[in-house]
Amino acid sequence: MGRLFGTDGVRGLANTELTAELALQVASAAATVLASPGSGGRKTAVVGRDPRASGEMLEAAVVAGLTSAGVDVLNVGVLPTPAVAYLTAALDAALGVMISASHNPMPDNGIKIFAAGGHKLDDEVEDRIEAVAAGTTTRRAPTGAGIGRVRTVPDAAERYLQHLATALPNSLDGLTVVVDCAHGAASGVAPAAYRAAGATVVAINAEPDGLNINENCGSTHLESLQKAVVEHGADLGLAHDGDADRCLAVDAAGSLIDGDAIMTVLALGMRDAGELVDNTLVATVMSNLGLHIAMREAGITLVTTAVGDRYVLEGLRSGGFSLGGEQSGHVVFPAFGTTGDGVLTGLRLMGRMAETGQAIADLASAMTALPQVLVNVRVADKRAVAASPVVLDAVVAAERSLGDNGRVLLRPSGTEQLVRVMVEASDIEVARKLADELAGTVASV
């Protein structure tokens, strides 16, 4: 068995790579590691999923794995990933399990695991779970009354909506938003949350049938949202992915507001309100150089981490900071959650618009992005290729040619057999040329 956990849990093609048998093994192993019985009595686990078709099969397997290890299951049904993380903490569960492949196509699925308090797992805990799943460490297997039971949480969505309401001090009355729910886990709660806050809401791609999740919609396909915002004369559009742990925006003209621009707007607002701890923002190495420049000009320190909101969260926790995120739209507010929360991000972004009376385009203009080119190269062994001397020499040469006018980032994907090549430069043609040359080198190794 190869390593199961990537940068965001276990993920693969459902029923071939991520099978029901593997899901049961992983869940049983997670229960063994995270929910060993103690003086507090029987342990519980929160289980949720996105609406893709394979979710029902994998949910049954995960529930079987958890209960076979003596853990009671609190099934919250179809809800966003951040809702499962929140409910894991709110319901005092020993762990939480979200069944989702996030922005991936419908045939894929995944398993994300949260520890008590709704926190993502660190590498050491993942290693222990993998050891149990592989059979090198004994798993728990109680009998009789020791086997776990299952119950649903009928008010799970309402609990999450009430939690979101506490994060927005002002009304969104007067704002019109188009929200693209990607036919995913936010199809019910995102429009409800925005309406409850006072916004006029036009919901699109909010009719999941198990097969249409992320299909030409959501945060990876903004075309329908951009068109709808202009057609409805909306103030902005918000796009979520399949499990709603991310949020991207478009302005009234349909232009993209990415995660870096969203973080700029939020960081400046929190700075002005005295809520930005140590005037520090946490972002990943993928954030545009323009974000670094904007934060420096605003007197805000930018701390960078590895890619993945779990690493952003680690950076936030280690420094006690109050805002962090990724260019992809994962934004973390530690005061309100332990993982990226797309719906919360949308609320806070609109809250800043309502507070200032400014259009999102004007607020986002505080950051000017450098042209960025990202090329994904499919390879047989992503780590070996990324560490190849030939590739490393090519990166050094590209960096030398850019000098202070850009940067190069080359890294293996955490979820797929890809090497990602990213080049930023003041001239888009220079960035494109260097990115293509590096991608060619990667492909040739």
Swiss-Prot record:
A Gene Ontology cellular-component term: cytosol
Co-factor note (free text): Binds 1 Mg(2+) ion per subunit.
GO molecular function annotations of the record: magnesium ion binding; phosphoglucosamine mutase activity; phosphomannomutase activity
Catalytic activity: alpha-D-glucosamine 1-phosphate = D-glucosamine 6-phosphate
Modified residues (Phosphoserine): S102
Binding sites annotated in the UniProt record for Mg(2+): S102, D241, D243, D245
Gene3D superfamilies: Alpha-D-Glucose-1,6-Bisphosphate, subunit A, domain 3, Alpha-D-phosphohexomutase, C-terminal domain
Entry-linked Pfam families: PGM_PMM_I (PF02878), PGM_PMM_II (PF02879), PGM_PMM_III (PF02880), PGM_PMM_IV (PF00408)
Modified how: Activated by phosphorylation.
Active site: S102
Gene Ontology biological-process entries: carbohydrate metabolic process; peptidoglycan biosynthetic process; UDP-N-acetylglucosamine biosynthetic process
Cofactor(s) the record lists: Mg(2+)
InterPro entries according to UniProt: A-D-PHexomutase_a/b/a-I, A-D-PHexomutase_a/b/a-I/II/III, A-D-PHexomutase_a/b/a-II, A-D-PHexomutase_a/b/a-III, A-D-PHexomutase_C, A-D-PHexomutase_C_sf, A-D-PHexomutase_CS, Alpha-D-phosphohexomutase_SF
EC number in record: 5.4.2.10
Broad EC category: isomerase
Entry keywords, A to Z: Isomerase, Magnesium, Metal-binding, Phosphoprotein
Domain of life the protein comes from: Bacteria
Family membership noted in the UniProt record: Belongs to the phosphohexose mutase family.
Task performed by this protein: Catalyzes the conversion of glucosamine-6-phosphate to glucosamine-1-phosphate.
Protein name: Phosphoglucosamine mutase
Gene: glmM
